[in-house]
From Swiss-Prot:
GO-annotated biological processes: lipid A biosynthetic process
Function of the protein: Catalyzes the hydrolysis of UDP-3-O-myristoyl-N-acetylglucosamine to form UDP-3-O-myristoylglucosamine and acetate, the committed step in lipid A biosynthesis.
Organism listed in the record: Sodalis glossinidius (strain morsitans)
Listed name of the protein: UDP-3-O-acyl-N-acetylglucosamine deacetylase
Source taxonomy: Bacteria, Pseudomonadati, Pseudomonadota, Gammaproteobacteria, Enterobacterales
Catalytic activity: a UDP-3-O-[(3R)-3-hydroxyacyl]-N-acetyl-alpha-D-glucosamine + H2O = a UDP-3-O-[(3R)-3-hydroxyacyl]-alpha-D-glucosamine + acetate
Residues annotated as the enzyme's active site: 265
Molecular functions (GO terms): metal ion binding; UDP-3-O-acyl-N-acetylglucosamine deacetylase activity
EC number(s) per entry: 3.5.1.108
GO CC field: membrane
Pfam family, one: LpxC
Essential cofactor(s): Zn(2+)
Length: 305
């Protein structure tokens, strides 16, 4: 039986909030089978839980938020959610003493290392996957995103940025997903933004944690970070990272092929909601026999330590 995963032990880290610029303490806790992914704000009394749920997602200019029925929100969940998807973590309590997850370096890599430091434990309960039975596509003008049946998980993402720093040849990326390929090829790709946008937001008391330490910053001509890019196609790789996190908002790894053109958080979420709304287009499956599990989800040795 392919089993659900959680953490072996509690781990903690501190970082800066993108919105407030203030220190945030992040605590990751193991959770029992079928708990799912739960984000928790401990700065509120009593603490407020936000189960990962496609319908709770709100897209803002800066990040992805989860919002409950009382309009209480937790922000900047997308990069940690991508790390959970990448390592196939089914059950976890994510606590922060702030309204947001810390931005760290703007990628998912610090979260991957934190999760691996905690260690990953299998639970005696079958892991559920969302498997596509029919193709589902959403569009908005020239932007679109699609999930289609495929016995594995692939992502094919194209961006269309007219900018001197983003070469035309580095605007499309294809990934045959596995935990290894996610960690090596996607998790280190950082979020990006324009210097003028960051300055404007900070003048209005927003994005106070935004800096060269947590994003690729560009002006009209070039990348301003002294160290440059981690990959020549880091921009599109980060958009793929975002998509992996967005599509995991249902709490289950997806068996299917994802293709997108100029998609972002809102479009990715619209696609996930469209899939879930069409009950004939998908099914939840478990695997008693590991031989039948798509290669994409075989547990690599570095994860199951």
């Amino acid at each position: 039986m392919i089993k659900q995963r959680t953490l072996k032990r509690i781990v903690q880290a501190t970082g800066v909030g993108l919105h407030t610029g203030k220190k945030v303490t992040l605590t990751l806790r193991p959770a029992s089978a079928n708990t799912g992914v739960i984000y928790r704000r401990t700065d509120l009394n009593p603490p407020v839980d936000f189960p990962a749920d496609a319908k709770s997602v709100r897209d803002t200019m800066l990040c992805t938020c989860l919002v409950n029925e009382h309009d209480v929100r937790i922000s900047t969940v997308e990069h940690l959610n991508a790390a959970l998807a990448g390592l196939g973590i089914d059950n976890i309590i994510v606590e922060v003493d702030a309204p947001e997850i810390p931005i760290m370096d703007g990628s998912a890599s610090p979260f991957v290392y934190l999760l691996l430091d905690a260690g990953i434990e299998e639970l005696n309960s079958a892991k559920k996957f969302l498997r596509l039975k029919q193709a589902v596509r959403v569009e908005d003008g020239d932007k679109w995103a699609e999930l289609a049946p495929y016995n594995g998980f692939t992502l094919d993402f194209t961006i269309d940025f007219k900018h001197p720093a983003i070469d035309a040849s580095s605007q499309r990326y294809f990934l045959n997903f596995s935990a290894e390929s996610f960690v090596r090829q996607i998790s280190r790709a950082r979020t990006f933004g324009f210097m003028r946008d960051i300055e404007y937001l900070q003048s209005r008391g927003l994005a106070l944690g935004g800096s060269f330490d947590c994003a690729i910053v560009v002006d009209d001509y070039r990348v301003l970070n002294e160290d440059g890019l981690r990959f020549e196609d880091e921009f599109v790789r980060h958009k793929m990272l975002d998509a992996i996190g967005d599509l995991f908002m249902f709490g289950h790894n997806i068996i299917g092929a994802f293709t997108a053109f100029k998609s972002g958080h809102a479009m990715n979420n619209k696609l996930l909601q469209a899939v879930l709304a069409r009950q004939e287009a998908w099914e939840l499956v478990t695997f008693e026999d590991e031989a039948k599990l798509p290669l994409a989800f075989k547990a690599p040795s570095f994860v199951m330590v």
